[in-house]
Amino acid sequence: MSKHDVERLPAACGLTCPQRLGQYWQLVRGDRPIGSLLLLWPTWWALWLAADGLPPLWTLFVFTAGVWLTRSAGCVINDYADRWLDPHVERTKSRPLATGAVSGREALWVFVVLMLVAFALVFTLNWLTVLLSVPGVFLAASYPYLKRHTHLPQVYLGMAFGWGIPMAFAAVQGSVPVLGWLLYAANILWATAYDTWYAMVDRDDDIRMGSKSTAILFGRFDLVAQGILYALMFAVLALVDLRADLGAAYWAGLGVAALLVAYEFRIARHRERGPCFRAFLHNNWVGLAIFVGIAVAGR
């Protein structure tokens, strides 16, 4: 047992069984589904594009369940990596690992179980999909440690959150075409942009604690940088249409998504914590709008 676990042990021992289950639920962010939705939409974009419509139902189930499992596992390993930092950050000081309600060892077991269940589901698909899941595990497990070494953890998050895209094409088509990699690139740009909103919420705390983020890197040019990222995302999504020939419905979806992004800049233009967090949450609707465009175009 680590020194941290010993120090936090009394907080964990005083909990009833329902309370402990509630702490585990918070640990996997079951009470905050936004992260799963931000991971789900690009995965569904890929499934619908790869299948040219509704994908096989079992494949759809595996990827939908896998989104929740891997996102939950990612949250657990993130909190484990930040268990020394989170007690000193306003937004994260009440997390189960930060308060000691869940020990570091327990968190690692939760991570392992979630990843094993996710891998068991992937194992029912073809071998290319199984092989692609291996770098997916590495991306999910290593992301939390990037903020100590680079100002670009948001880019890495986009790589991790979007890895379901090449896996989806592999599962449906047996290969990953250029279209799949274009969609993956668009997702990296999107995730970097929306997670910068999130990083702006914590910017003052991160500077004080020595953590790194794109919000710190961009500084006073943060809104300009995000505008460029979103513009590049839409440019790459336009290239997706050149490959897939999706038509008017897809462009209507992109148009709605662009209006939603413009609204984010309006509400967060003064960079306050609350509006920046709302702008981050608002990206759920951006992902949904793009998905609806793809789904209608594929009918």
UniProtKB/Swiss-Prot annotation:
EC number: 2.5.1.39
Co-factor(s): Mg(2+)
General function of this protein: Catalyzes the prenylation of para-hydroxybenzoate (PHB) with an all-trans polyprenyl group. Mediates the second step in the final reaction sequence of ubiquinone-8 (UQ-8) biosynthesis, which is the condensation of the polyisoprenoid side chain with PHB, generating the first membrane-bound Q intermediate 3-octaprenyl-4-hydroxybenzoate.
Membrane topology: Multi-pass membrane protein
Keywords carried by this UniProt record: Cell inner membrane, Cell membrane, Magnesium, Membrane, Transferase, Transmembrane, Transmembrane helix, Ubiquinone biosynthesis
Any Pfam family the entry gives: UbiA
Protein's UniProt name: 4-hydroxybenzoate octaprenyltransferase
Transmembrane regions listed in the UniProt entry: 34-54, 57-77, 108-128, 163-183, 221-241, 245-265, 277-297
UniProt keyword annotation of Protein biosynthesis present: no
Recorded catalytic activity of this chain's protein: all-trans-octaprenyl diphosphate + 4-hydroxybenzoate = 4-hydroxy-3-(all-trans-octaprenyl)benzoate + diphosphate
A cellular component annotation (GO) from this entry: plasma membrane
High-level lineage: Bacteria, Pseudomonadati, Pseudomonadota, Gammaproteobacteria, Lysobacterales
Family, similarity comment: Belongs to the UbiA prenyltransferase family.
Main location: membrane
Pathway stated in the Swiss-Prot or TrEMBL entry: Cofactor biosynthesis; ubiquinone biosynthesis
Disulfide bond annotation, renumbered to this chain: none
Coiled-coil region list: none
Transmembrane recorded as keyword: yes
Gene Ontology MF term list: 4-hydroxybenzoate polyprenyltransferase activity
